[in-house]
Amino acid sequence: MPSSDSPFLLDVLGERCPMPVQRIRKVIKEISEGSIIHVLGDDPESIHDIPVLLSRLGLEPPIITRQENGWLFEIKV
């Protein structure tokens, strides 16, 4: 896993619920506290599901940026 100053990129483009959330949860368990995860996804459900997951884990809401092919979620662990 990367250090806290190097974002970890998780590409879930083309994956549908529940896979993006399951993969994010796995990375969060393995990554160092203070790290940043960049998630690229295109499942419209992720706009709702990822913030809910982070809230349940006690983490800050993601920064969400619209991309040409979906969304970029910036998650701070």
Predicted segments, located by residue:
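Right-handed parallel beta-helix/beta-solenoid
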Residues: 2-11
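Amphipathic, hydrophobic secondary-structure cores in small proteins
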Residues: 12-63
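C-terminal edge-of-domain segments
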Residues: 64-77
